Amino acid sequence: ELDFEAVMSSQQRLQGIFGSGSPWPKSDMTLEENIASLKVHKQEFALRQAFAYSVFNKTKNKCLGSVYIDPSDSPNYQCVVHLWIRDDSIELDHELFQTVRKWLQEEWRFSNAAFPGRYFEEPKPAKKVKSTVECQLPRKD
């Protein structure tokens, strides 16, 4: 419910965060639809295909936003990251962005992360990697 409240409190600004063709979040999205979406994120996380994180305040009684780490379709980027902060905490947006960039570089060892609509790391020469069906993100336990 905390995630749903955060999404709906910022629904208009979040429209198009995943690209102009994405309908998320719909203005009439229900709690049940939100829960179904969270279940998909949980399954993707378990399968190591993509990683979604909720961002909470210190007391964990308010969801402030989310971070989504997905595989990149481009060989120039190791991952694609979308993140958002709810409208009433928007002053934390830049801090979250900088924290996530640093975390990906230092802990995940991602040197080329794309942040659509925000920032793209300068592409480095792509390394040849074995093509697999699932995302090959470093394991973070």
Q: For each predicted feature, which ranges?
A:
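ATP-dependent phospho-/nucleotidyl transfer catalytic cores
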Residues: L96
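GNAT-family acyltransferases
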Residues: E1-D88, T99, W103, E107-D141
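Phosphate/ribose-recognition catalytic cores of enzymes acting on nucleotide-derived substrates
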Residues: D93
